[in-house]
Amino acid sequence: CKQIFGIYEGLTNMKFIAEFCQNHNGDFKILERMVAEAAESGATHGKIQTIYSANLAFRPEFENGVMIGEKVLVIKRPYQMEYDRLKKLELSTKESEKFVKLCEKFQIIPMTTCFARENLNEIADVGFGAIKIASYDCASFPMIREIADRFTDIVISTGATYDSEIKKACDILAGCDFELLHCVTQYPTSLNSMNLSRIPWLRQFTPRVGLSDHSLVSRDNVWACKAALYLGATSLERHFTVLPPDKTKDGPVSISSTHLR
């Protein structure tokens, strides 16, 4: 029986997605370490992101951000700075192919998040065993339809999504092997904002519901993940790193192999 976060019972079919995101800093050697350590620590899936700077859209409101009093309505993320940042983090098609083979070597399932419909051919050709639809694409219905036609292991995140959009996405995926992830798109997410009661609520759409956890590791450890398991979560996703927390953008919300064990 698989152990995840020190819990054994009922985890035989448990899925743990080690989200490598951009924690490799564009260095494939670091990504190789991440795959090895995640696999050795109990992960069932290793996930990267198929994201390219060329797909980045210019949005004027992000240039300076939008504030209402002390509340952030739109974050400040200038286009050119974000373009340059993403460009340094891109993995080539050949590197994605190497990643898939590396995951297979370590007997974990290679997975990616698709951020643009035009990249689906590449993802299919590379041979990813599973695909994730990000929260902000839960309402990208044309892309979801194409994914439903082409992939057999689908995970869809539900942060920043209206309930009606979740229902429509699930209607499109009816008949597919898919799983929902409860997610709060806040980095980091406080435990008070985790809203784990959404996990049983989401089961009206599918019996397979998990948690994508973005809590602050130094403050909240893996408590949200453990609580989700006791609520019957069938999968967990966490950002994963082999570097110190201050060395990557998502480092503070990323666990290490020590946490996973």
Identify the role of each PLM range.
Residues 1-261:
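Catalytic cores and adjacent flexible loops of soluble metabolic enzymes
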